[in-house]
Amino acid sequence: MSSRLEKFYKDEVVPALMKQFGYTNPMEVPKLVKVTLNMGVGEAATNKKILENAVGDMTKISGQKPVVTKSRVSVASFKIRDGWPIGCKTTLRRHKMYEFLDRLINISLPRVRDFRGVSGRSFDGRGNFNMGVKEQIIFPEIDFDAVDAIRGMDIAITTTAKTDAEAKALLAAFKFPFRN
C-alpha cells in the first residue's frame, strides 16, 4: 500500500527529474530518505507535564511515539542538569514519511497565517532541507482547544541528492511551496 505522494514520485517526479538533469537510470534520481521531527521543550526541566503534552502532540502529528531527548551537559544559566529530559524527536521513513509530507504540503503549510512560502535557502549544502514551524496547531490532528501551549518544531528532510539544486528540484516537483 503506497501513499498518494509515493505514487506521484514514481509516476511523475522520476521521469521529470531524469529529463531535467539528464539521468540515464531511474535509480540515479534523488529520493527522500527520512523526515526528522524535533521539538525542543526547554520548560520541561521544571515541569514534567509540559513534556508529556509535547510528546502527545508529536505522537498525533507523526503517527508514532517520539523518543524523549535528554540534555548532554549541565548549563547553570538555563537551569538544566545533565540527563534531564528537554525535548522529543521522531524519524519518519517510507509510507509514514510520504503521508506526513503530503499533509504538510497540502494541508498544514497553507494554514499558516501570512504564509508566503518556505525559504529556498534552508539547504545544508549536501541536499538536505531544514525548516521550522512556529505553531503545532497548523496540523489538522491537533485539537486547538486541548492545546496547553503553542510549541514550534524543526523539520529536517533528508534526501539522496548530491547537490542543493537537485534537492530543491526534487522538493519543487513535490509541489513544495518555495518563496524564491
From Swiss-Prot:
Give the transmembrane ranges.
none
Q: What are the alphabetically sorted keywords of the record? A: Ribonucleoprotein, Ribosomal protein, RNA-binding, rRNA-binding, tRNA-binding
One GO molecular function term?
A: structural constituent of ribosome
Q: Which InterPro entries match?
A: Ribosomal_uL5, Ribosomal_uL5_bac-type, Ribosomal_uL5_C, Ribosomal_uL5_CS, Ribosomal_uL5_dom_sf, Ribosomal_uL5_N
Family membership? Belongs to the universal ribosomal protein uL5 family.
Read off the NCBIfam families from this record: PRK00010.1
Query: Tell me, what does this protein do in biology?
Result: This is one of the proteins that bind and probably mediate the attachment of the 5S RNA into the large ribosomal subunit, where it forms part of the central protuberance. In the 70S ribosome it contacts protein S13 of the 30S subunit (bridge B1b), connecting the 2 subunits; this bridge is implicated in subunit movement. Contacts the P site tRNA; the 5S rRNA and some of its associated proteins might help stabilize positioning of ribosome-bound tRNAs.
Per UniProt, subunit arrangement is:
Part of the 50S ribosomal subunit; part of the 5S rRNA/L5/L18/L25 subcomplex. Contacts the 5S rRNA and the P site tRNA. Forms a bridge to the 30S subunit in the 70S ribosome.
User: What is the protein's name according to its record?
Assistant: Large ribosomal subunit protein uL5
Please tell me the species this chain comes from: Stenotrophomonas maltophilia (strain K279a)
